[in-house]
């Protein structure tokens, strides 16, 4: 073994297997780009992002950890969200939940 060497298992790795997902169409109504990270509670994103917020409650972007999606001003795109796991207790972000989902 070499320090830092990666030894992935054979085959494909499926992210968030078996978890509930939902797709939402998002429009950036602002005049600046907005970037949303992989583990940000999507319901609590920047108010300039227009989408069905209630559909996103308890969900985050279904992308690899440590990555993000950027929404340019005036851009509309559909993204897939995945249900938050664990105890499903949310604190911080924009302070809209501050407890159990």
Curated annotation (Swiss-Prot):
Keyword line: Cytoplasm, Hydrolase
Q: Which reaction does it catalyse?
A: urea + 2 H2O + H(+) = hydrogencarbonate + 2 NH4(+)
Pathway field of the UniProt record reads: Nitrogen metabolism; urea degradation; CO(2) and NH(3) from urea (urease route): step 1/1
EC number(s) stated in the UniProt entry for this protein: 3.5.1.5
Which SUPFAM superfamilies does the record match to this protein?
A: Urease, beta-subunit
Residue runs in coiled coils: none
Entry GO terms, CC: urease complex
GO biological-process terms attached to the record: urea catabolic process
Q: What is this protein called?
A: Urease subunit beta
InterPro entries, from UniProt?
Urease_beta-like (IPR002019), Urease_betasu_sf (IPR036461), Urease_subunit (IPR050069)
Q: Main localisation, per the record?
A: cytoplasm
* MF-aspect GO terms: urease activity
PANTHER family, alphabetized: UREASE (PTHR33569:SF1)
């Amino acid at each position: 073994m070499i320090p830092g060497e990666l030894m992935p298992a054979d085959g494909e790795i499926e992210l968030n297997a078996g978890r509930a997902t939902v797709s939402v169409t998002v429009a950036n109504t602002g005049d600046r780009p907005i970037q949303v990270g992989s583990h940000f509670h999507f319901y609590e994103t920047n108010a300039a992002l227009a989408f069905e917020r209630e559909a996103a409650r308890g969900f985050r972007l279904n992308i690899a950890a440590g990555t993000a999606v950027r929404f340019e001003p005036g851009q509309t795109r559909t993204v897939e969200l995945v249900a938050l796991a664990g105890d499903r207790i949310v604190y911080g972000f924009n302070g809209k939940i501050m407890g159990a989902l």
